[in-house]
Amino acid sequence: MAKFDAHLKCSFCGKSQEQVRKLIAGPGVYICDECIDLCNEILDEELIDAQGNPRHGAEPSKKTAAGGTRKTSKPAPTLATIPKPQEIKGFLDEQVVGQEAAKKVMSVAVYNHYKRLAWQGDGQGEAAQTATRLHKSNILLIGPTGCGKTLLAQTLAEMLDVPFAVADATTLTEAGYVGEDVENILLRLLQKADMDVEQAQRGIIYIDEIDKIARKSENPSITRDVSGEGVQQALLKMLEGTVANVPPQGGRKHPYQDCIQIDTSQILFICGGAFVGLDDVVQKRMGRNAIGFVPNDGRGRNRATRDIQAAQVLRHLEPDDLVKYGLIPEFIGRMPVSAVLEPLDEHALESILTEPRDALVKQFSTLLSMDNVQLDFEAQAVEAIAKEAHRRKTGARALRGIVEELMLDLMYELPSDQNVTAFTITKAMVEEHTGGKVLPLPGTKQHKESA
């Protein structure tokens, strides 16, 4: 038996019993004292991140599970470093076309939120000298698909240099049912912050498709609505502010799992959705139900007119309208700031193609410049692309699909053709998806136009 024991080795590092001081046996596995010390260091590091201090009697370690060192947390915002509302809106104007009213609402709301964090000072400083408590105001964005709801939230996080996470409300279910727990939203934010709890607690979470968790009727149902009203109930404490237990590996929580604690009282939640049919609810309350038909000129202008009218009606939105739509009053009360985004017209789509810093025209010009090809778009070609995107009724998302279809053959052939150094996208090429006008530079050979 002693001879057999001499061949025992650690199941993790592979060292034999003679190479270590202690070898502990388990059901079919063995672990040495060195691996136990390494595990303790990893656990100490996770507890430091979750609670801000190491375990009692243990010295903090700077090692991570990957063997590297963690970056230090960024300093908390101060009243002097927070950008003013006009500065925030100016930055949004560089990235997002149109939506002036929504950008103004969000600029003020975000400024007040981070001003509140600076005032609190993590429970110290100025806030300790006054009895006034500042409560956070989450934001509800209402607008059709492709109008810029996600981009607005993402641009705000980029400017403020805070972690940003996007969640899909349609994948969430009430605890105990198949689907994602609401705590998994916080895990995504934590991962964006490199598992830095302090940094994650100053981040922004955007919950998309929030209108899809509306309950089926205004009256409470006697049956269980695990993906509708049940999710709204589960989100209440998280939106208001609570200390949530987040499983570090995701998935369902169980009693024997170590969880990371995150305080959500400083996290800004932005919820967005299309809310199709909400304008009808508002019109019914205002007594403006119209009976009749809108003439169609064959180019879909009746649909565009209806979208614009819907956005105008939603400016008179009241909390009771959202209750009739299917959101519970407790959920609406935790989203005190709301902004309505308007549908994008053809002129706005043209601006999106050319004006922002990351405009599609600039992106594809940069891609082809890496192949020493200068790409240009005629003004009429840009108009044709915007017109086609407007016809597809998916907002700005349609633009990339159209340009990708348009550029497929060109980006396949041009990198291999050394004779072409410039290319111009024309209106005819957009309308027919064939041909193009090649503009060779002096000393280059004329490239054949495709049929």
Curated annotation (Swiss-Prot):
ClpX-type ZB domain span: 1-51
GO MF: ATP binding; ATP hydrolysis activity; ATP-dependent protein folding chaperone; protein dimerization activity; unfolded protein binding; zinc ion binding
Amino acids binding ATP: 144-151
Annotated GO CC locations: HslUV protease complex
Keyword annotations from UniProtKB, A to Z: ATP-binding, Chaperone, Metal-binding, Nucleotide-binding, Zinc
Pfam families registered for this protein in UniProt: AAA_2, ClpB_D2-small, zf-C4_ClpX
Record's protein name: ATP-dependent Clp protease ATP-binding subunit ClpX
UniProt cross-references to Gene3D superfamilies, sorted A to Z: 1.10.8.60, ClpX chaperone, C4-type zinc finger domain, P-loop containing nucleotide triphosphate hydrolases
PROSITE patterns: CLPX_ZB
Annotated function: ATP-dependent specificity component of the Clp protease. It directs the protease to specific substrates. Can perform chaperone functions in the absence of ClpP.
Organism: Synechococcus sp. (strain CC9311)
Residue ranges, annotated region (Disordered): 50-79
Keyword RNA-binding among record annotations: no
Listed GO biological process terms: cell division; proteolysis involved in protein catabolic process
Family to which the UniProt record says this protein belongs: Belongs to the ClpX chaperone family.
Superkingdom, natural source: Bacteria
Subunit structure: Component of the ClpX-ClpP complex. Forms a hexameric ring that, in the presence of ATP, binds to fourteen ClpP subunits assembled into a disk-like structure with a central cavity, resembling the structure of eukaryotic proteasomes.
Residues where Zn(2+) binds: 10, 13, 32, 35
